[in-house]
Structure formats: C-alpha cells, structure tokens
C-alpha cells in the first residue's frame, strides 16, 4: 500500500526545499503523513489487520520523532510544516 508516483511528486513539490529535495525533514514527515492517512482508510475496512497496524504504529512513531527533531532544530520550519499538514502540535 504505497503512494502513487503522482502523489509523491506532488508532496515533493509542495514540501521540498528545492527541485530534487527528497530527504529534508519536512518531505519525510509529509510522505509519512500521506501514508498514514492512506492506511487509515484501509483499517476502516479491515479492522483485524494487526500486521499492518504494527507498520502504521511504526510510521506514526517515525513521524513523531522527525517532528520532534525539526522542532528542536528550527521552530519556524516546524510550525509552518504543522500548519501546512494540518497536524496537531
């Protein structure tokens, strides 16, 4: 259940610092957020899919750690990213 190439390209264009930016913290958090949102729809249909739920929890944890890193290093970029993604603090 990965994201389509078009979705990834749109996220890279929206959150990347330059044209070929694929590794900045904002891009990583945005990609994880898109995957998490995609999986939430999957779990509405497949309630007992515990194997995938474990992967979802790993993604949520990774997103939380990356967000904490960005907040620690550059608060302005962190707040802009949170507002753009519509995440809670």
Swiss-Prot record:
Record's keyword terms, sorted: Ribonucleoprotein, Ribosomal protein, RNA-binding, rRNA-binding
SMART domains membership: Ribosomal_S15 (SM01387)
Any one of the GO BP annotations: translation
One GO cellular component, as annotated: cytosolic small ribosomal subunit
InterPro entries xrefs: Ribosomal_uS15, Ribosomal_uS15_bac-type, uS15_NS1_RNA-bd_sf
Superkingdom to which the source organism belongs: Bacteria
GO molecular function: rRNA binding; structural constituent of ribosome
Keyword presence, RNA-binding: yes
Quaternary data: Part of the 30S ribosomal subunit. Forms a bridge to the 50S subunit in the 70S ribosome, contacting the 23S rRNA.
Family per similarity comment: Belongs to the universal ribosomal protein uS15 family.
Main function: One of the primary rRNA binding proteins, it binds directly to 16S rRNA where it helps nucleate assembly of the platform of the 30S subunit by binding and bridging several RNA helices of the 16S rRNA. Forms an intersubunit bridge (bridge B4) with the 23S rRNA of the 50S subunit in the ribosome.
Record's protein name: Small ribosomal subunit protein uS15
